[in-house]
């Protein structure tokens, strides 16, 4: 990897997803990171929480936070594919340091 950076991803998934479905969804996206030569820490599942305001007709969501290292293009692609999934209500990727 030439220019890998550290990132923190938080996404909010549909509250209707059970624990197994949420883990499967998370693993699907983290595969993209490893396939492109990146690495990640163990995902932190915060569970179902009330949203500050309604998003896409939902008042609750399953929160997941993952720290990972990847190239900027991989991070951009991860954000793009997360936003295409209807089970993902909101995403935020922050570059760390």
From Swiss-Prot:
Binds together with bS18 to 16S ribosomal RNA. It comes from Bifidobacterium longum (strain NCC 2705). This is Small ribosomal subunit protein bS6. The keyword rRNA-binding applies. GO terms for molecular function: small ribosomal subunit rRNA binding; structural constituent of ribosome. It holds the Pfam family Ribosomal_S6. Keywords: Ribonucleoprotein, Ribosomal protein, RNA-binding, rRNA-binding. SUPFAM superfamilies: Ribosomal protein S6. The lineage of its organism: Bacteria, Bacillati, Actinomycetota, Actinomycetes, Bifidobacteriales. The gene is rpsF. GO terms for biological process: translation. Belongs to the bacterial ribosomal protein bS6 family. One of its GO terms (cellular component) is cytoplasm.
């Amino acid at each position: 990897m030439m220019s890998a950076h550290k990132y923190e991803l938080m996404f909010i998934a549909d509250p209707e997803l059970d624990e197994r479905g949420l883990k499967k969804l998370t693993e699907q996206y983290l595969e993209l990171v490893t396939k492109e030569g990146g690495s990640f820490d163990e995902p932190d599942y915060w569970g179902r929480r009330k949203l500050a305001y309604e998003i896409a007709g939902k008042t609750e969501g399953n929160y997941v936070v993952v720290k990972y290292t990847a190239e900027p293009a991989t991070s951009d692609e991860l954000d793009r594919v997360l936003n295409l999934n209807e089970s993902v209500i909101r995403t935020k990727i922050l570059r760390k340091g």
